[in-house]
Amino acid sequence: MRTQSATTTITRAVTVAAGVFAPGHLGELTQYLPFELVDDILEQTRTVQRRLRDLPSRVGVYFLLALGMYPRLGYARVWAKLTAGLEGLPVACPSEKALRDLRRRLGPAPLKALFEVVAGPLAQPHTRGVRFGGLRTVAFDGCNSLKVPDTGRNRWWLGRIRYRMGFAGYPTLRLMALAETGTRGLLGAALGSAADRDEATVARRLLPLLHPGMLVLLDRAFDANAFLGEVAATGALLLARAKSTRHPYVLGHLPDGSYLSHLDGLKVRIIEATLTMTGADGSRVRDSYRLITTLMDHRRFPAPAVVRLYHERWEIEIGHRWYRSSCAAFSWLRSFVVAGFRFLRCPAGAAVEARRACPAFA
């Protein structure tokens, strides 16, 4: 027999939960969101099923996580993925209505608690590229690509984005995230209306996650005296790009070309720079940047190094690529009611964090 015609039989053992709990898993990712963790979350949020039937609460949590990982698929097809490797086991075959009822029965509380446990810094003390001068670099950014069905209730809650030529076709959610720039690991997330032009409104809900030892990178959408003062009040240091309309007072010049100023009593250092970007075709684009920072020591944090650091803020933009690319593939989110949108942050975030923790499946 020719060698290229030879065959090999591969068998493997799969360990799953017993009985009606068997569909509750995420395959290889289950080790990062184990049964014990999910059961503890259900106990804490008092969402354990009262009677053990075909769809227990633990199975519901993993089903909702799978919905976040397969946003293009309907309920039945996502359930089929959870049960595809369970041939020979007496697993339930629920209707889509039963799965919708399971989702409503759980509510957002267990998913929110699970997200808060899983989200957090991923970098180890020895990880390179996650610190600047001993400070952990993090960044805020908003994603406005999450459209919801155009119903009266959704328009009342979210409004619609207004453009020069009219209103957007669908009400839109804003997903505000706080991420570690070196690993793109989520530290927290919050949902709000994209019709509110002020991104800082949603970002304020994430300020309790900041603490001394952090350096927050902000784009010019967050350049407001009140918000910058609130960030500084957490003990974290900040580096923000100023709007083109801001012209700070000069209180004193520093040897590296930066100067001192203040914003409503907040002492800051201003760094001005002109950046030239060269494209692959040789074309050049120039832009002027005015950076606001509370890194006051120009010897420890020289202006050229701070300007180079600001580029790291784009890491959170890359982290948002998954949300933008997946949401661009379909018209709107699957839920038609406000309560359903509150599930968005939790299953998607926890699933993404689990996938990032296991590089082979990222």
Where in this protein do the model-derived segments appear?
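Single, function-defining residue in the core of a domain
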Residues: 1-77, 103-106, 113-114, 133-135, ...
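DNA-recognition alpha helix
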Residues: 74-90
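Generic beta-strand or strand-like secondary-structure segments
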Residues: 81, 98-101, 117
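Solvent-exposed amphipathic alpha-helical surface segments
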Residues: 85, 89, 121, 125, ...
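Major-groove recognition helix of helix-turn-helix-like DNA-binding domains
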Residues: 90-108
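Short Lys/Arg-enriched helix C-cap and helix-to-coil transition segments
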Residues: 109-122
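Short acidic (Asp/Glu) patches
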Residues: 120-124, 153-163
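Long amphipathic N-terminal alpha/beta scaffold segment
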Residues: 123-131, 147
